[in-house]
Amino acid sequence: SDIRIIRKILDTLTEFNEQGVPVKGTWDTENFFSLQKILPEYAPDIIDKMKERVIKYGDENIIMGYNNGALSAMTEDEFCESINLAITNPDGSGLEDIFGTCEKIVRPQEVMFTPSQVSLYNKLGIKALCLYYSCVPFDAFRTIIPKLSDEEAFNPLTYTYNGESMTIIPTYSNSDVCDAGCLRAW
């Protein structure tokens, strides 16, 4: 199950840290289902370990959106509410509520992106988006920009739409490994 996998990842990261390897996690967890409902009931130890790792090893929490909704399909009000509630909310399941801090970086649900929302991300103080520059066509940033060089494809870049810019952090998925044939070839 996902809970066992997350526990194993947390334990593995901590084992490496204890061996002197400076690894840290970047977590993108939606709030309503995972941080407010499921984990507190079935795996509160995961939240405790994540909190500990934020303090002790510098793990980061980035925004996904409050309720796992498709940010790219939301109205302006829904979009703003989802981002704001993901940061802090009356139920205490915001990233700042739980972890005391969060990075103003968004990895939207299914990494879906709508260029017209760049202005909304900027309005909310979001510093960057993590988007697949990937071979997955339904949610790939790659489909709306010119091909990037290898250097550009593995480093943050600036995306501009209608005069507004923001930083995009290209990310990848297991489908990219499959597209290359194997991890070594990728």
Where do the language-model regions lie?
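Substrate-binding cleft and catalytic face of glycoside hydrolase catalytic domains
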Residues: 37, 59-77
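Active-site-adjacent pocket scaffolds in enzyme catalytic domains
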Residues: 110-186
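A conserved hydrophobic secondary-structure block that centers on an alpha-helix together
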Residues: 77-123
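Alpha-helical scaffold elements lining the catalytic groove of polysaccharide deacetylases
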Residues: 69-95, 161-186
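Conserved, mostly hydrophobic/aromatic
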Residues: 64, 106, 169
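Loop/turn elements at helix/coil->beta-strand transitions in domains of secreted/extracellular proteins
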Residues: 19-25, 57-60, 100-103, 124-127, ...
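A short, flexible beta-alpha/helix-coil linker loop
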Residues: 32-34, 67-72, 135, 176
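Active-site beta->alpha N-cap acidic-glycine motif
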Residues: 1-56, 114, 129, 134
